[in-house]
A protein has these predicted regions:
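An N-terminal, well-structured beta->alpha segment
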Residues: 1-58, 64-65, 143-163
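N-terminal small/polar loop signature for handling phosphorylated ligands or for N-terminal nucleophile
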Residues: 41-104, 187-241
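Gly/Ser/Thr-enriched, mixed-charge loops and adjacent short helices
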Residues: 105-223
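Conserved small/polar residues in nucleotide/adenosyl-binding loops
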Residues: 275-282
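A short, N-terminal amphipathic alpha-helix
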Residues: 29-37, 218-219, 259-263
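Gly/Ser/Thr-rich active-site loops/lids in small-molecule metabolic enzymes
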Residues: 193, 246-265
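Short beta-strand-to-turn element immediately C-terminal to the catalytic PLP-Schiff-base lysine
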Residues: 109-112, 239-243
Length: 286
């Protein structure tokens, strides 16, 4: 087992080389052991070519420790967090390579409502090395959480003016859900590379890389759209293009989001990292 896959905030490696069936089933057993018997966890995956295999195997490992599994299928990463909170599960795992190159995959994990990171990830590794697993028989249930997520999001949305939007899911998980949401709220939109495809035929889904945003930029300008939004492969990261075709980076987006929060919830505290490029400037402009 390549111990370098156990990183600070997730487990990640080359799917065929590092995330073999033996490694994955043992990660599942270790995760199930820290969750505890007779508990329930939600498990979802992205559309990478290796994800179905990895999901099937890790579910097998988790269930072998007496933990019940809610299999929520192919979903964006935020839906695993939604499932954990909505259905009050005891944890969750998202199988995803995120914005990394095609051959990668990995795991984002929660115990209870909290993300597993740092020493907790290293503890998983030690359980695997020592092979100290709980033993039991957990149930596996296939569950649809997308409809509940859609209802929740739609109830929280309020569109103040009509906009024309171009989106580029990059053939990742965002396409079906985002297009459905935009249709339901009556937004005029164009979708590029909407169909989920783990080969990522258009470009790697990483909206922080300017060259991967070129198609979106050109479409925003040619269609005279108000905004363009690009997503990464598991839909927990976005890149934004303004109406002139310029990239709007995360430091500026923070100010936009903070301003909206303060408008609706005056007096709220906005916490930022001071490694953030505009952390000093943002409060002065809100």
């Amino acid at each position: 087992m390549n111990q370098q896959i156990f990183r600070e905030y997730d487990i990640r490696g080359m799917a065929d080389r590092d995330l073999t069936e033996d490694v994955v089933i043992n990660i599942g057993k270790a995760f199930g052991t820290i969750i505890g018997a007779n508990k329930t966890v939600a498990v979802g995956c992205d559309i990478r070519l290796s994800s179905p295999r990895i999901k099937k195997t890790i579910i097998e490992g988790i269930a072998s420790t007496g933990v019940n599994v809610m299999d929520i299928g192919v979903v964006p990463t935020p839906l695993v967090y939604f499932a954990v909170h909505r259905y009050n599960t005891d944890g969750g795992i998202m199988i995803t390579g995120s914005h990394n190159p095609i051959g990668y995959n990995g795991f984002k994990m929660l115990k209870g409502k909290k993300t597993i990171y740092g020493e907790a990830i290293q503890s998983l590794k030690e359980i695997i090395i020592n092979k100290k697993y709980n033993v039991g028989t957990g149930g596996i249930k296939i569950s649809d959480v997308i409809s509940g997520y859609m209802d929740t999001v739609l109830k929280s949305l309020s569109i103040e003016k009509t906009m024309k939007v171009v989106i580029d899911p990059g053939n990742g998980t965002a396409g079906p859900i985002v297009t459905s949401l935009l249709s339901n709220i009556g937004v005029d939109f164009i979708c590029l590379n909407c169909k989920p495809d783990g080969h990522f035929p258009a470009h790697l889904p990483d909206p922080t890389v300017p060259e991967y945003m070129n198609e979106l930029i050109e479409k925003v300008k040619s269609s005279k759209a108000d905004i363009g939004i690009g997503f990464d492969g598991d839909s927990d990261r976005i890149g934004v293009i303004d109406e002139k075709g310029n990239m709007v980076y995360g430091d500026r987006l923070l100010g936009v989001f903070a301003k909206d929060v303060l408008k609706n919830m005056p007096g709220s505290t906005i916490t930022v990292s001071y490694t953030h490029l505009r952390a000093h400037e943002t409060p002065e402009h809100l």
